């Protein structure tokens, strides 16, 4: 009898716990209306926080929130001593690691690519650095370098820069966060502005519109000054920090991010898109007049690289706009997920099915990748053409005694016929300040050859150009010989007569030389006579 009564009491206790205990603990808190005037002053007094939430007691809630701690807050203002982990729960730990690894790998490549471009177009390597287009490439490369530098700074720190501890997000008061945030913002803004300026300059070059050089300094100073303003304005409201969707510190306040980056970026994208379409139209007109379909191949690469940068910026802008419009929904899903964690912690595990609160890895991965491909796109567009090779071959780093002792960059022992003329033409084109993507040089060569009645495919290999030059020079020499033979032999085209004419020409030359020598002797005699007098 006693044993039956004992089991009956246990059954009542278990039934009461399963049916009444958990709703009373949480639901009464969530549905309660606190009599306190300030929301968030009512806490769930428990030291237990369901994973992955972390427990941290706070006696100064508002102060700790300003220091980067994100306490769990329910819709009715109820607070707990549980905080969100850093990095955020919008991605799994594996997803965060994947994105960080990709970022560091691609950023490292872009970092050294930007250094290569900076060296190539700097006064150290490039004697014709003081023109608008070269300054634009150099400045854009420096902006990309700054963007990638913030990732390189994370090689050892990884998540510790944005997450000083597993419970705290970095804010502007953290020196590393502020410095990297400023560098990243200035690099992004200046790179976008100079990229826009380069697209406009490319259009001016193709259409042969000359802009006064006095504006070069004005535009360089103006772009950097505007970039500095957009960089330091958010500092006023302490808007720099580490967010829920980032790998590094940037502007947290949406209004400041909108005014100091997204609106300028959208304006630059619209403007650059129009300019790119105008460039494509100009190139189309040139090739339509040439009646050669294959000639378009010489310009596909530079134009695709220019357009790819535009797509990269468009994706960054579009995805960020998508996150901004979905932010309220994402926060609601996170609140529902956290509520589900508390409910399951008070009941049997998995008693409640928690809603999906995470973002998909693919779009966010592509967002980070697009930013870090800027350096790769830059070196493809501006670092892989004949002009860059010429700059490096003539630079002090390559063209010196030490390198020349062990390496030779000459393709052969003999100098091709007409090489001087070709070098002179290339130098003149290079001094015209474009020569960076190769497109303008090819267009000008094409126009010149159309005027002369010679149409060839532009953008060919250097060897083909040399062979064509040699063939043209040989043809010119043969024509000259034929003309001489024709003049001396009354247009007789037989090979034997040509040889005889050559011999006659040689004899005539020898006779002329003898006459010149006799003349020189007579002159010397006259001079001596005068001296004697």
Swiss-Prot record:
Give start-end of the signal peptide: 1-21
Coiled-coil residues? 501-528
- Extracellular compartment ranges equal 22-103, 156-177, 238-259, 324-360
* Glycosylation sites noted in the Swiss-Prot or TrEMBL record: 76
Q: Which InterPro entries match?
A: GPCR_Fz/Smo-like
What sections of the protein cross the membrane? Answer: 104-124, 135-155, 178-198, 217-237, 260-280, 303-323, 361-381
Query: Which domain of life does this protein belong to?
Result: Eukaryota
Instruction: Output this protein's name.
Output: Frizzled/smoothened-like sans CRD protein H
Q: Which UniProt keywords apply?
A: Coiled coil, Glycoprotein, Membrane, Receptor, Signal, Transmembrane, Transmembrane helix
What does the UniProt entry say about where the protein is found? Membrane
Q: Where is this region: Disordered?
A: 454-533
The UniProt record lists the keyword Transport:
no
Family membership: Belongs to the G-protein coupled receptor Fz/Smo family.
Provide the membrane-side ranges marked Cytoplasmic in the record.
125-134, 199-216, 281-302, 382-533
């Amino acid at each position: 009898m006693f044993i039956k009564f004992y089991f009956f009491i246990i059954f009542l206790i278990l039934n009461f716990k399963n049916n009444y205990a958990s709703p009373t603990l949480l639901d009464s808190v969530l549905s309660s209306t606190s009599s306190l005037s300030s929301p968030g002053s009512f806490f769930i007094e428990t030291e237990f926080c369901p994973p992955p939430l972390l427990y941290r007691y706070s006696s100064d809630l508002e102060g700790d929130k300003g220091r980067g701690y994100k306490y769990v807050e329910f819709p009715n203002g109820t607070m707990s001593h549980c905080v969100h982990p850093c990095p955020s729960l919008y991605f799994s730990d594996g997803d965060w690691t994947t994105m960080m690894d990709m970022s560091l790998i691609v950023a490292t490549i872009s970092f050294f690519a930007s250094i290569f471009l900076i060296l190539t177009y700097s006064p150290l390597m490039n004697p014709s650095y003081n023109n608008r287009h070269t300054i634009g490439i150099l400045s854009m490369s420096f902006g990309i370098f700054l963007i990638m530098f913030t990732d390189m700074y994370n090689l050892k720190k990884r998540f510790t820069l944005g997450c000083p501890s597993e419970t705290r997000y970095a804010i502007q008061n953290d020196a590393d966060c502020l410095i990297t945030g400023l560098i990243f913002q200035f690099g992004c803004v200046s790179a976008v502005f100079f990229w826009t300026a380069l697209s406009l300059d490319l259009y001016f070059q193709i259409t042969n519109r000359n802009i006064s050089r006095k504006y070069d300094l004005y535009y360089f100073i103006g772009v950097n000054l505007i970039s500095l303003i957009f960089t330091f304005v958010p500092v006023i409201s302490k808007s720099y920090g580490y967010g829920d969707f980032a790998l590094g510190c940037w502007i947290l306040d949406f209004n400041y991010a909108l005014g100091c980056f997204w609106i300028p970026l959208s304006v630059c994208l619209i403007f650059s898109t129009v300019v790119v379409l105008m460039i494509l139209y100009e190139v189309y007109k040139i090739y339509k007049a040439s009646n050669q379909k294959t000639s378009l191949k010489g310009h596909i690469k530079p134009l695709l690289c220019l357009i790819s940068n535009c797509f990269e910026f468009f994706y960054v802008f579009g995805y960020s706009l998508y996150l901004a419009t979905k932010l309220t929904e994402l926060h609601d899903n996170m609140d529902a997920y956290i509520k589900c964690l508390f409910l399951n912690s008070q009941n049997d595990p998995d008693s409640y099915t928690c809603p999906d609160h995470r973002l998909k890895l693919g779009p966010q991965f592509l967002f980070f990748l697009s930013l870090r491909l800027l350096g790769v796109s830059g070196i493809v567009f501006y670092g892989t053409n004949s002009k860059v090779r010429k700059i490096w071959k003539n630079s002090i780093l390559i063209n010196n005694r030490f390198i020349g002792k062990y390496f030779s960059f000459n393709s052969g022992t003999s100098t091709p016929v007409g090489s001087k003329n070709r070098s002179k033409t290339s130098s003149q084109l290079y001094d015209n300040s474009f020569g960076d993507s190769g497109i303008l040089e090819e267009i000008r060569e094409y126009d010149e050859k159309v005027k002369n009645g010679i149409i060839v495919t532009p953008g060919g290999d250097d060897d083909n150009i040399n062979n064509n030059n040699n063939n043209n020079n040989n043809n010119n020499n043969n024509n000259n010989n034929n003309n001489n033979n024709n003049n001396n032999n009354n247009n007789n085209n037989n090979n034997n007569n040509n040889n005889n004419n050559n011999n006659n020409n040689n004899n005539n030359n020898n006779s002329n030389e003898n006459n010149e020598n006799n003349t020189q002797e007579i002159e010397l005699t006259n001079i001596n006579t005068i001296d004697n007098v």
